[in-house]
Amino acid sequence: MSAKEGSSHPSYAEIVREHAPEQTAAEKAAPQPPEVEEVLSEEPYQKNEKVVVLDEEDADAFLHPEEAEAKKESEKPSDGEKKGKTEKLEKEAKSVYSKACNFVNAHKVPASAAISINLLSLGAISAYLLKSRQSGTLNNRTLCTCTAIAGIVFTISAVFSKTPKTACCASKKSNKST
């Protein structure tokens, strides 16, 4: 039986030894693998340990704080440079935002098409649920899935249906004209 006291079941290694075929000469000549002992870590187990992944610059700053501080001080811009950078970033953000508004508005469909899509999808979901109910396969999972699909369809149609220009897009266009 096993080497452990009180164990009524043989170990996996013992079962393999009992049912293994005879070893060949080459197998007998091969060195035996080292015995593995169970070693428990002496450090306490940390269940909710969080790992933080740093990018290369942050990792360098963490490993070499003196160099990072010297680099930061040498890179400090003057007030004029700060103002220029801020204006440049604001201008770039405005152009990106206006491009995003134009892209979204260009790919929208008329409200009548969105309503038709909603009705069509709602009808298909209702037909599926009715068929499931009649066949006796309707369950909570099916209901939840169909509810989620309906919510997704309605959300997508709301996003991609034409509506009056939003205040933020209109304000951006009025800022361009001034």
Swiss-Prot record:
Compositional bias annotation for Basic and acidic residues: 44-53, 61-89
GO cellular component terms listed in the entry, alphabetical order: cytosol; mitochondrial outer membrane; mitochondrion; nucleus
GO biological process assignments: protein targeting to mitochondrion
Superkingdom assignment: Eukaryota
Bilayer-crossing regions: none
UniProt-annotated stretches for the region Disordered: 1-89
Protein name: Uncharacterized protein C11C11.06c
Organism: Schizosaccharomyces pombe (strain 972 / ATCC 24843)
Lineage: Eukaryota, Fungi, Dikarya, Ascomycota, Taphrinomycotina
